[in-house]
Amino acid sequence: MKFLRLIPLVLILIFSNLGYLVEASQKYIQISNQKQTESDKIIIYEFFWYGCPHCYNLEPTMDRIEMNLDKDTMLIKVPVALRDTWEVHAKAYYALQQMKLDDNLHEKIFTEIHINGNRLDTKEKLEEYIKDQGYNAKSFVEYFDSFGTDLRVKKGSRLANQYQITSVPTLIINGKYKTSGSLVSSYDELYDVVQLLIEKERVN
């Protein structure tokens, strides 16, 4: 009888420990058993939107991740248009990428939107901003309206559909694992999770 009275306590302890394990495992989600990228490198996709405050807050962590990448790993930023109103920012990123200005202006655009309050939500506002930054605004508009930029936006949308991206920021590691700020307690922890998943892929 004494043993039977102990069973509920034992079950509580077991399920408490199981709860901890489930919580730990949910810091990332395995979405595939197979690598879904064509590159020989370990690919990290960062799905983002310039208007997203969480994406802005994540930027220092993404910089840290990128600075510490080894030669076998690559970070690819994907400005996803989950809503029609987001497309202007996706086109802006790809226009700047083709002008080789994405590294120069990526963080500055986040700052302009989230600190200075300039939403940059039209082509005209972006054109004026590019001009104020001392770059060729005419060239920016040409790239913004180009067929090549439209193709890049569509490719980003296909990737988002493939990985079932429903919110940003979201990171996909080598087509197999998904993680985001909503699955961890801090951005430092997100950094650690990304490093863990990179190492898992190296071993594989």
Walk through the language-model features, giving the residues of each.
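Conserved strand-to-helix beginnings and helix N-cap segments that scaffold or border functional pockets
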Residues: 56-59, 86-90, 184-187
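Extracytoplasmic thiol/disulfide redox context detector
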Residues: 2-84, 154-157, 161-162, 167, ...
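Sec/Tat-exported extracytoplasmic proteins
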Residues: 51, 66-69, 96-100, 113-117, ...
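C-terminal cap of thioredoxin/glutaredoxin-like
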Residues: 132-204
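Structural microenvironment flanking redox-active thiols in thiol-disulfide oxidoreductases
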Residues: 71-98, 103-131
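Solvent-exposed loop/turn segments at secondary-structure junctions
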Residues: 50-54, 81-85, 111-116, 148, ...
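Extracytoplasmic/secreted envelope proteins and their assembly/folding machinery
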Residues: 59-66, 89-93, 106, 123, ...
